[in-house]
Amino acid sequence: VYVDSSVLIASIGNESYGEWARGVLAGKEAVSSAIAKVELARFVHWVGQLSDYLRPVISAVSFAKVDDQAIAAATAVSGEVKALDALHVGTWAHLKTVGVECPFITLDRKQAVAASRAGATVLHPFGDLS
């Protein structure tokens, strides 16, 4: 599965979607964009000492480079979502072009819509996205 930072962050703590995030990730191989490492580090700095919780999350995820192809794919959705969210969708789209077929998991409604429009099967807790 391709997992957005919002899901990784929720899986660490007791946020409202924490249980959902842990359940949807359980037993799955996960990949995310390398930018997720920065987003996770920012979260840790924001909430304090969570490094003991962060290490297992980071070690369970493969991180894909943000290369020119991912950036090019991100520009296609950059008008719909924030820049980092577009980079996640772009990274997923690039992975698809190199043969990695996987659903996109997010806790961001706008990003879910953008990923769906980009062709992803999107797992999210929101019900209908329309």
Q: Which role does the model predict for each range below?
A:
Residues 1-32, 43-56, 120, 126-130:
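Short, well-structured N-terminal submotif of metal-dependent ribonuclease cores
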Residues 7-8, 36, 70, 88, ...:
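Alpha-helix capping/helix-boundary segments
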Residues 20, 39, 73, 91, ...:
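Phosphate- and divalent-cation-binding pockets in alpha/beta enzyme and binding domains
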Residues 33, 94-130:
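Acidic, PIN/NYN-like endoribonuclease modules and their adjacent C-terminal/linker elements
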Residues 3, 32, 65, 83-86, ...:
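Short beta-strand scaffold positions
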Residues 59-95:
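Acidic catalytic patch
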Residues 27-30, 60-62, 98-103:
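Short active-site oxyanion
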Residues 18, 37, 51-54, 71, ...:
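A general structural signal for well-ordered alpha-helical segments in protein cores
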